[in-house]
Amino acid sequence: RGFAIKACLPYSYGPGMPGPYIAIIYNALCDSAQGVAFSPAIGYNVPCINVQRGIAMSCDLLVGSTGFVGGNLLAKHTFAAACHSSDITAQYGTCPDLCVYAGVPAAMFLANADPEADLAVMRAARENIRQIAPKRLVLISSIAVLADSRGIYEDSPAQDTEALPAYGKNRLQLERWVREDFPDALIVRLPALYGAGLRKNFLFDLHTITPAMLKPEKYSELAAKSPLVKSAYTLADNGFYKLNGTADPAALRAFFAANDFNALAFTDARSRYQFYNLGRLWSDMEAARAADVKLLHLCTPPVSAAEIYTAVTGKADWHNELPKPPFDYDLRSRHAALLGGSDDYLCTKQQELDDITRFMRSWRD
């Protein structure tokens, strides 16, 4: 009942380490086998390929497994392997059939504060992908690579990048490197997101109401009103007062819900966003890959912050206008119909608001 197959694949396992990549596939006592690969250059076993009844099965890898996007992908699909920044080198040379790279940091503030350091992170991402050497690649990117998303499709002419902040410019550079290295890769541009583990954006602020950070003058004002606020925030290295986790979240929420100032003060009610539910990301990517799509905009219709507030709370009493022009996102897709949508979007505006409302009302801390 047992069998063994040896396969030699020519491959340079890591920089300057030429050598055979040996796979021994075995099945001793059962109807399925787990393949392992051994590299003389590295000296340990790494996952290679699954065999069931003698038939090779697809092997896939998720990079960024501990992140917001990665966590939601793991909830929808069982990957053969998953890793993050601290253990990614263990996946070098594994050559998976598919690599979903969701490991690019989404810290916009840090990227714009230190553009060169952020670009170095993009270079590292490129090298990670090269060293993993997948047969097929999906890169999770962002709408932020566009200076103006209004009316922009996947096949729209390239925009001038001079107006792009470092966050968007550097991620656009990574897209270009990936296209150079992997011409058949699927690049997915995501707009504003929601799903399990959400920790930022307007939906998070609407749920928590409690500001994550306060300017010193605002902290002093609120701390004078409330001992709860005074003890709940600590001065951070960036000069802002940051939540320290010591106060009861429900008590803080009650205080800020009754206060003129809360987390909603940071959003212009007129701003329009496109909110995408990460629960559908895996199925949308699979449909796009099956259709051999190379660039995909996962875009829902633009909805204003005020419209979301009213849909979720049932009230129309929130009006907030900031000095700067409001955000206005309106990304379009040529592939909306492929994913069950129409008219350039994945769903209707009402469907989007209904889904956001369901998500917000089912949210548990």
Q: Residue locations for each model-derived region?
A:
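N-terminal Rossmann NAD(P)H-binding glycine-rich loop of SDR-like oxidoreductase domains
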Residues: 60-77
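A short beta-strand-loop structural module common to alpha/beta enzyme folds
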Residues: 79-92
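NAD(P)-dependent short-chain dehydrogenase/reductase
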Residues: 184-274, 280
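NAD(P)H-binding glycine-rich loop region in Rossmannoid oxidoreductase-like domains
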Residues: 15, 89-135, 139-154
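Short, low-complexity intrinsically disordered segments enriched in A/P/G/S/L with frequent Arg
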Residues: 9, 19, 37-40
